[in-house]
């Protein structure tokens, strides 16, 4: 089932703005979000190493956009909603 809406938290917006100022490529983020919206499990598993998080982040998932650039997200299936929560490096996020 394809997701129909994207919600970006205010923290995600701040994280993304800071990364783009450091010349991270916004098209990589856009491509990953498109794969998430389409629920393309093959691409998410192989290209982005999609996995569930534990501990305080239980209920959230994480993908690797490149080396040490992560995207933390959550899917609310009842509303077909993708919630982009945080983005940044391991050191920055954890």
Report each predicted region and the residues it spans.
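Basic, Lys/Arg-enriched alpha-helical interface segments
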Residues: 1-67, 76-82, 87, 91-94
């Amino acid at each position: 089932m394809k997701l129909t809406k994207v919600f970006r938290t205010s923290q995600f917006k701040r994280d993304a703005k800071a990364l783009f100022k450091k010349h991270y490529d916004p098209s990589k983020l856009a491509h990953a979000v498109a794969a998430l919206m389409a629920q393309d499990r093959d691409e998410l598993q192989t290209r982005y190493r999609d996995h569930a998080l534990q501990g305080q982040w239980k209920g959230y998932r994480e993908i690797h956009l490149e080396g040490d650039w992560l995207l933390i997200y959550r899917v609310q299936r009842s509303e077909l909603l993708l919630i982009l929560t945080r983005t940044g490096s391991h050191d920055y996020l954890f």
